[in-house]
């Protein structure tokens, strides 16, 4: 009996907080077109993600994937760091 795994959501966003141990907060921007006016509206949603090695820093662009619940608010894990933040 072969069981197929469900497709998991993968998001790309910016790390807005890395103050917690092994946890990052990622802001994901989504653009939707308004039904009546046709204007693109930007929505931002924040997700907490598991970062096992504390590799991601604030300002990094990261990719996160849906996973089993790791805590009350953490349902994503870090897949990879797409772009590191530039420190001026």
Curated annotation (Swiss-Prot):
CDD domains: Ribosomal_uS17. Transmembrane segments: none annotated. It comes from the Bacteria. GO terms for cellular component: cytosolic small ribosomal subunit. One of its GO terms (molecular function) is rRNA binding. InterPro entries: NA-bd_OB-fold, Ribosomal_uS17, Ribosomal_uS17_bact/chlr, Ribosomal_uS17_CS. GO terms for biological process: translation. Disulfide bonds: none annotated. Keywords: Ribonucleoprotein, Ribosomal protein, RNA-binding, rRNA-binding. SUPFAM superfamilies: Nucleic acid-binding proteins. The keyword RNA-binding applies. Belongs to the universal ribosomal protein uS17 family. Part of the 30S ribosomal subunit. PANTHER family: 40S RIBOSOMAL PROTEIN S11 FAMILY MEMBER, SMALL RIBOSOMAL SUBUNIT PROTEIN US17M. One of the primary rRNA binding proteins, it binds specifically to the 5'-end of 16S ribosomal RNA. This is Small ribosomal subunit protein uS17. It comes from Leuconostoc mesenteroides subsp. mesenteroides (strain ATCC 8293 / DSM 20343 / BCRC 11652 / CCM 1803 / JCM 6124 / NCDO 523 / NBRC 100496 / NCIMB 8023 / NCTC 12954 / NRRL B-1118 / 37Y). The lineage of its organism: Bacteria, Bacillati, Bacillota, Bacilli, Lactobacillales.
């Amino acid at each position: 009996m072969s069981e197929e795994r469900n497709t998991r959501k993968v998001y790309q966003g910016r790390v807005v907080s890395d103050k917690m141990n092994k946890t990052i907060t990622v802001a994901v921007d989504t653009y939707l077109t308004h039904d009546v006016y046709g204007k693109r509206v930007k929505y931002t949603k924040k997700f907490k993600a598991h970062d096992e090695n504390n590799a991601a820093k604030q300002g990094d662009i990261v990719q996160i994937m849906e996973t089993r619940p790791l805590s009350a608010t953490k349902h994503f894990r870090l897949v990879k760091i797409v772009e590191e933040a530039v420190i001026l």
